[in-house]
Amino acid sequence: MSASNIHFEMAERSQALNYGGIGAIHLMGQRLGLAQEIDGRLQLLKRHLPYHESDHVLNLAYNALLDGQRLEDIELRRNDEAFLDGLGAQRIPDPTTSGDFTRRFNEDSVLTLMEAINATRQRVWEKQPGDFLWHAFIDMDGTLAGTFGECKGGMALSYKGIWGYAPLIITLANTREVLYLVNRPGNAVSHEGCVPWIDRAIELVRPRAAEITLRGDTDFTLSAELDRWDSQGIKFIFGMDAHPKVVQLAESLPETAWKALERLPRYEIATEPRCKPQRIKEAIVRFKGYLNKKLVGESVAEFSYQPHKCGRSYRLVVVRKNVSVQKGEMVLLEDIKYFFYITNHTDYCAEQIVALANERCDQENVIEQLKNGVNAMRMPVDDLLSNWAYMVMSALAWNLKAWYGLLMPNRERGLELLRMEFRRFLHLIVMLPAQIVRSGRRIIYRIMGYNDWLKDFFATWEYLRRMAPA
């Protein structure tokens, strides 16, 4: 990099933008009937001059898709003539108008918006292979969304001492789509009010899934609901607190009931195995004589257990971890920890139940992307309901990413796109420099850059172009 004689000049007037992939995303939404679904269900505006409800919703979703960090970033797009021409828009709502739109929502209208998005989602699922969602995994968890605001309505102080909200997130693990988002005060526990939303998620995927499994941590082991879900044919794998009764039952098992738990490697080595690097942290901990807990071994067993509010017993899979407590080079004691998983699955062995339960941890990655990828949990507006609406509209950007991957003709590349972080998706698919040319009735995006996903981008665009509108 030796360039030093650098000058800047104004170019001749031309229309270009650095996120040409937005045209393909917009075309996908049109073919799926997303805007029509929103406008047909959501009635918040008395007069649709100059905007419809879908214009406001897509404006916030596209702001996230164009790497917008704040509501104020919408102003950049309002003044971008190439962006407006690329979407065939005369104008888009400004940040203040977008914030005002979120304050029009009540709980029913937020639900209506989510159902409009889910109706569009069903059209994506209809175009998938026959074995798609043969076994659907619905994951659920709560998280904290802090805010520095002093006047945010509905916020509360969480158990961590953070002011803000405590959203409930229900996702489909197979595609990493967000099915439902529920905003709650910051002092809400993870499972608070979750049952109706779990039931809605079940009804959403039931027409497509031959089998449904619910997964959650110990907070979601709702013993009053397990029998009902079991009678409906719904499977579940939930963590369970290691309270004294189940610990005593685990300790009373004969040693022959336990067998070593072998963890499968996370990936296969394609070339030759390499030497593992030295663990610098552990070396420092030993040298300094700090307290160090090291896993020595794991074993697994199972027994039947009937929770207090259940009318029948279920499998309780228990993992016993042998932890060596060390200080420097000296072993202080051997500590035994128990982890429990309750399930009504009968066709999986104990090791497979543990593996499936641990796979739910991938939902933490989805939550991270919602927080810092699409920035859906910044809570920038007035109160609990308006921030809930903002959260749903911004999270639509994450679902648009998933739908684009599901509609990609190259199935392998599409599944790879589902696993991508949001920022990588933006750089590979959305942030394609393009010149905007209006020719007759056509809007032409002339791509001016290249990456190794461009072949798949054009194949997907051709597929979307030929797709019959909903």
Question: Predicted segments — roles?
Answer:
Residues M1-A188, C194-P207, W229, G405, ...:
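Dynamic "connector" segments at or just before major functional cores
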Residues S2-A11, K235-V366, N372, A459-A470:
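An anionic, glycine-rich sequence signature occurring as long contiguous blocks
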Residues Q15-A16, K46-D55, V331, V381-Y390, ...:
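Structural motif
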Residues N59-L60, I74, I92-D94, S98, ...:
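Short, conserved catalytic/metal-binding motifs centered on acidic residues
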Residues R70-D73, T147-G149, V178-Y180, A224, ...:
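Short helix/loop capping segments that flank catalytic or ligand/cofactor-binding pockets
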Residues I74, A350-L384, W388-A389, M393, ...:
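Short amphipathic alpha-helical "interface-anchor" segments enriched in bulky aromatics
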Residues S190-K245:
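Domain-level cores of phosphate- or acyl-group-handling catalytic modules
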Residues N399-R446:
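C-terminal structured "cap/appendage" subdomains that terminate the fold
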